[in-house]
Amino acid sequence: NKNLDVLLEQVFKHAAHYELMLDFHVDEGLEPEAAAFDRIVDLTHQFSMAGRVLCGHACSLSVRPTDEVSRVISKAADAGVALTVLPTTNLWLQDNQNGTTPRLRGLAPMHELRAAGVPVLLGADNVADPFFSMGTYDALDVLRNASIAAHLAPADWLDSITTNPARAMGRDINEIKIGGSADFILIEGNSWEDALRSPKASRQVFRAGRTQSIGKEAA
């Protein structure tokens, strides 16, 4: 889009004026020249909107030169931009060529982003639709797939499906502690490995200490 810079700046001007938060689906492709994420990072800094801008996908970061990626990641951390990686969607759609085994994963560099201080979220944006019929909103299943695809240590990335998404939406999430609100999901299993090995295991959802639902896919 030849007018992308102008349009993005207009969006930021309105968001800053009306104190809105912004969410972008950006650079969802494997073209190395795709760099709208960079512009969003610059505008976030320019309009002092740290903590109010969330981007999704940024698949092109996986194929751009390493030095470019390092620079934009550092700038994103300084600007306060968060990034959602959509592992199942990106793995399915990127480098998807009929009859050819994919060689590119299309996943944004999660380890590097996190190491630089960029809040990383995990999510899914294609659920039982023509783009990805096997998609699910189940956050635990998303974490499981991301752990396999990006070699994550699952227990260390729990914030990617809990606190980081909450903060990106401007919400607080209570910790489990004495005197805190007893809002949590109890998953059947003896360890993280059990929970991820059987993502459809029985769950119980608690709100203020009371059971809200019991089932294999409680939400």
Give each language-model segment a name:
Residues 57-59, 87-97:
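Short, basic, glycine/proline-bearing loop/turn elements
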Residues 61-63, 91, 128, 192-193, ...:
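Surface-exposed, flexible loop/turn segments at secondary-structure boundaries
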Residues 34, 65-68, 95-97, 132-135, ...:
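Short, well-ordered secondary-structure micro-motifs
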Residues 1-54, 60-82, 99-122:
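Histidine/acidic residue-rich metal-binding segments in metalloenzymes
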